[in-house]
Curated annotation (Swiss-Prot):
This is Putative aryl-alcohol dehydrogenase AAD14. Keywords: NADP, Oxidoreductase. Its EC number is 1.1.1.-. GO terms for molecular function: aryl-alcohol dehydrogenase (NADP+) activity. InterPro entries: AKR_Detox_Biosynth (IPR050523), NADP_OxRdtase_dom (IPR023210), NADP_OxRdtase_dom_sf (IPR036812). CDD domains: AKR_AKR9A3_9B1-4. One of its GO terms (biological process) is aldehyde metabolic process. Belongs to the aldo/keto reductase family. Aldo/keto reductase 2 subfamily. NADP(+) binds at residues 236-246. It comes from Saccharomyces cerevisiae (strain ATCC 204508 / S288c) (Baker's yeast). The record marks 103 as: Lowers pKa of active site Tyr.
Length: 376
């Protein structure tokens, strides 16, 4: 009986200090999400090799460190990612402990049936959604998906068809929460307005590309997420592995390795070198050599409910990523990082400014007519 009121032990790492996903999704998730794009060996030609044993070791390390949220997609590694994650959860008897997120939209059968024969295995339409979820449930060896994302907006299905079809899956219990990835803010806003106006399930989380070098999120995505109470799950936070310190790049060259990424050559671009040097400087101020930890800490400092996706194939990289959770950047450090590559917010923010409720500053136009305090 005394154990009933006994305080919980501290988590093994800060990864185990869970957070509520968003205002519209009360599920508790780890502050970093393990990305499943590298889990599998079908794409080894451009992502590096990872066999099943290595994948299970990485998944074990993530879970043992306190992580509970894993992100994948129907098409990753020609379906191996979902299959291996499903096998891992089943072999460890951990399905109920894991928050699994997957995606539909991508053509996940082209490799099997051939080009031109897989048209209805992709897209945002109801048929694509139906077969994708059917197959994802089988591959993941589960009865439900915690978070289902639209992988990207294909402009070929109406918002009404998409949101109605997704809501049916939620009603059936096959999906619990909805997310959207790589989609214009106006589409997400229209979709969430339609959903909430018609008693349907809205999107609770947005996933997209965001890092200190690519800050397009700040134009419309972050304000949209703030308005609808959505979480943000940025990918490419580490620049696709291209944010590397000078020391790390020299080590790679010594070992005969280049940068292995989706895009870009084996060498860093001039901008990547500059931002890597800036990240290295801030890392030294925090007593670490991990550039990636600073890159993760940066996006976490920019908005509420930010859950960065972390990838990679090595446990040592996972440990570096977890280190970010103990780092809090100062306003001066954030300002320094952002000064390396100036960001143009574009019109209309360049004219009217940002939301004064967030910035605590009046817009340039309003300040000419009124004096307003922001004490609340």
């Amino acid at each position: 009986m005394t154990d009933l009121f006994k305080p919980l032990p501290e988590p093994p790492t800060e990864l185990g200090r869970l957070r509520v996903l968003s205002k519209t999704a009360g599920i508790r998730v780890s502050p970093l999400i393990l990305g499943g794009a590298s889990i599998g060996d079908a794409w080894s030609g451009f992502m590096g090799s990872m066999n099943k044993e290595q994948a299970f070791e990485l998944l074990d390390a993530f879970y043992e460190a306190g992580g509970n949220c894993i992100d994948t997609a129907n098409s990753y590694q020609n379906e191996e990612s979902e299959i291996w994650i499903g096998e891992w959860m089943a072999s460890r008897k951990l399905r109920d402990q894991i928050v699994i997120a997957t995606k539909f939209t991508g053509d996940y059968k082209k490799y099997e049936v051939g080009g031109g024969k897989s048209a209805n295995y992709c897209g945002n339409h109801k048929r694509s959604l139906h077969v994708s979820v059917r197959d994802s449930l089988r591959k993941l060896q589960t009865d439900w998906i915690d978070i289902l994302y639209i992988h990207w907006w294909d402009y070929m299905s109406s918002i009404e068809e998409v949101m109605d079809s997704l809501h049916i899956l939620v009603q059936q219990g096959k999906v619990l929460y909805l997310g959207v990835s790589d989609t214009p803010a106006w589409v997400v806003s229209a979709a969430n307005y339609y959903a909430t106006s018609h008693g349907k399930t809205p999107f609770s989380v947005y996933q997209g590309k965001w890092n200190v070098l690519n800050r397009d999120f700040e134009r419309d995505i972050i304000p949209m997420a703030r308005h609808f109470g959505m979480a943000l799950a940025p990918w490419d936070v580490m620049g696709g592995g291209r944010f590397q310190s000078k020391k790390a790049m020299e080590e790679r060259k010594k070992n005969g390795e280049g940068l292995r990424t989706f895009v870009g050559g084996p060498e860093q671009t001039e901008l990547e070198v500059k931002i890597s040097e800036a990240l290295t400087k801030i890392a030294e101020e925090h007593g670490t050599e991990s550039v990636t930890a600073i890159a993760i800490a940066y996006v976490r400092s920019k908005a509420k409910n930010v859950f960065p996706l972390i990838g990679g194939r090595k446990i040592e990289h996972l440990k570096q990523n977890i280190e970010a959770l103990s780092i809090k950047l100062t306003p001066e450090q954030i300002e320094y990082l952002e000064s390396i590559v100036p960001f143009d917010v574009g019109f209309p923010k360049s004219l009217i400014g940002d939301d004064p409720a967030v910035t605590k500053k009046l817009s340039p136009l309003t300040s000419m007519s009124a004096r307003i305090a922001f004490d609340n």
